[in-house]
UniProtKB/Swiss-Prot annotation:
The keyword Manganese does not apply. Keywords: Cytoplasm, DNA-binding, Transcription, Transcription regulation. This is Probable transcriptional regulatory protein PFL_4766. It comes from Pseudomonas fluorescens (strain ATCC BAA-477 / NRRL B-23932 / Pf-5). It is found in: Cytoplasm. Its main location: cytoplasm. One of its GO terms (cellular component) is cytosol. Coiled coil: none annotated. InterPro entries: Integrase-like_N, TACO1_YebC-like_2nd/3rd_dom, TACO1_YebC_N, Transcrip_reg_TACO1-like, Transcrip_reg_TACO1-like_dom3, YebC-like. GO terms for biological process: regulation of DNA-templated transcription. Belongs to the TACO1 family. GO terms for molecular function: DNA binding.
Amino acid sequence: MAGHSKWANIKHRKERQDAKRGKIFTKWIRELTVAARQGGGDPNSNPRLRLALDKALGANMSRDIIDRAIARGTGAAGSDDVVELTYEGYGPNGVAVMVECMTDNRNRTAAAVRHAFSKCGGNLGTDGSVAYLFERKGQITFAEGVDEDALMEAAMEADADDVVSNEDGSIDVFTSFAGFYGVRNALEAAGFTAADAEIVMLPTTSAELDLEGAEKVLKLIDMLEDLDDVQNVYSNADIPESVAEQLG
């Protein structure tokens, strides 16, 4: 059941980039607003809002900012016209890429995403062109030092899909999309405190890259992540550790 995550280096790199660019607040303000609009402003009855709230608090966002974002979503602070969009395409070396956005201007966002693909040697595709290569999953991460055997037993009892040990000592518990909140709550009840928890798009197949290919694909991912309207970028790029070390 346990294994090594091929995409851990991409995830950790993305986290560094998010923090570096200061996009964290903008990202979670949008997520709070959309989650509240879709499921209401009470995090106790809105799991998506609860997750966004936890993320925002973890990023040291003030309660005042959080409350205003939720109020916009529920209409208590005026209307909000932000919509969720997903773009799909192929990057260099045939790497499949999915781009999740939140925007108040579809045309602006589509043009910016299309430009990034074109500039970096990729092609923006149509809906469904690469989505079949990904599965929406829950990912619950525990820091180094957690009792792996006990965590694995608790995860199996909670009907988790997989438990993965990473090279940095952390452990990821993967769940179905529908079972994410149930597994997360069960593990918390069993005494395990997660370092992170999120809904992700995991590739079902991977495209292994050499150094040149990795540099091209990461250039595209960087350009996409720099766009103001982009929330998340997922790919099926598999960058071996030997190549990742050369990237720095």
